[in-house]
Amino acid sequence: MADFLTLSPEVNSARMYAGGGPGSLSAAAAAWDELAAELWLAAASFESVCSGLADRWWQGPSSRMMAAQAARHTGWLAAAATQAEGAASQAQTMALAYEAAFAATVHPALVAANRALVAWLAGSNVFGQNTPAIAAAEAIYEQMWAQDVVAMLNYHAVASAVGARLRPWQQLLHELPRRLGGEHSDSTNTELANPSSTTTRITVPGASPVHAATLLPFIGRLLAARYAELNTAIGTNWFPGTTPEVVSYPATIGVLSGSLGAVDANQSIAIGQQMLHNEILAATASGQPVTVAGLSMGSMVIDRELAYLAIDPNAPPSSALTFVELAGPERGLAQTYLPVGTTIPIAGYTVGNAPESQYNTSVVYSQYDIWADPPDRPWNLLAGANALMGAAYFHDLTAYAAPQQGIEIAAVTSSLGGTTTTYMIPSPTLPLLLPLKQIGVPDWIVGGLNNVLKPLVDAGYSQYAPTAGPYFSHGNLVW
């Protein structure tokens, strides 16, 4: 995987565009789905015939023995059908990951055109007149490099996660009798669908920096590497001892991501929700509990998936899944200042509602992070400036939050039975003052300033100063 960081866009783009495409993966997914349907039908038919025989025509000890063996065979068929569904889901996940990576990869023709332009400019740069144009072209090339690196890293992460879960079909069938209580199975075999007892942690990343590299082109590759590292860390301390599997979706917000060709927020979230759903189905097929952690924009993907699972008759049981949303901007900034259903055209984003869910969910935010904990009295400019600094210091770091760091703010049980518990990671020192600490200003001075400024900042939040005047909630001014 590491070679993606050092390979030029000429290589990474050529690799992606030279591939065979997702057609074979989609065909495999369809074939596995068809096999699963046939196995489920066979199981139902066999069970119906045996039940009818035992209920009407065949009674006694031999009938009961037959029924026990028939139930084992029916269970074998059902378990095999579940495995076939899991294989279909994995193939579809890979197809979606390829499509996302392909869309995010720079076309080789654009890379070649950029290199040709630089060569021409350099060749005619007799008096240095082309130096600014060369620098601009090189900056674009650095962006291409960063864009390809992120695309390939995310694609590799999904492929690695899928590959880790795949096992030989013959081995799975051999282990089915033991799973179903058979007597002639090898007790040393591993579990059917999970070779490790480690719980899976599906991570859903926040917005990608792939296009933002135009702002800082020469560190684009470092941004890509930092983003990939952060994505595997999301929820690592909230669910310790779990194995991360990253959902590789576009994670862009239209032109605000730094490119006219970037996918808008609604499309990114929709793609992410579909990919997350496939990951959940594949992971829960093992019978092991699964955790899901989303950071920032990833928390919005989780909310869309929770809403879908709430109406899905085939959703996994409530005991199979646990969610955590970290530094979510929708439950924070968006739902503070905008009514649900409001669309922001420049981002292609429509504000969603917090869904009812059958699953237990933790909502975690860092105090004074403007994305997840904005001041609901925006006319308090000091609170606003402090919250901007809070985002810079705390937003991404919320990915590493642990339960013992949080203060429980609220716990609400929905009509579907799931409890949503909100936690705040407190910041004793105002983010506005953290730069002073970093440059070595004595603690007693910083502490004194904190004591003076904190009440003024907290007046910008109705939760800290409920009697300090009106405030915004869901886009409405509350008096």
Curated annotation (Swiss-Prot):
<dbReference type="GO" id="GO:0052572">
    <property type="term" value="P:response to host immune response"/>
</dbReference>
<dbReference type="InterPro" id="IPR013228">
    <property type="entry name" value="PE-PPE_C"/>
</dbReference>
<dbReference type="Pfam" id="PF08237">
    <property type="entry name" value="PE-PPE"/>
</dbReference>
<feature type="compositionally biased region" description="Polar residues">
    <location>
        <begin position="187"/>
        <end position="202"/>
    </location>
</feature>
<dbReference type="InterPro" id="IPR029058">
    <property type="entry name" value="AB_hydrolase_fold"/>
</dbReference>
<dbReference type="InterPro" id="IPR038332">
    <property type="entry name" value="PPE_sf"/>
</dbReference>
<protein>
    <recommendedName>
        <fullName>Uncharacterized PPE family protein PPE63</fullName>
    </recommendedName>
</protein>
<dbReference type="InterPro" id="IPR000030">
    <property type="entry name" value="PPE_dom"/>
</dbReference>
<feature type="region of interest" description="Disordered">
    <location>
        <begin position="180"/>
        <end position="203"/>
    </location>
</feature>
<comment type="similarity">
    <text>Belongs to the mycobacterial PPE family.</text>
</comment>
<feature type="domain" description="PE-PPE">
    <location>
        <begin position="240"/>
        <end position="462"/>
    </location>
</feature>
<dbReference type="GO" id="GO:0005886">
    <property type="term" value="C:plasma membrane"/>
</dbReference>
<dbReference type="Pfam" id="PF00823">
    <property type="entry name" value="PPE"/>
</dbReference>
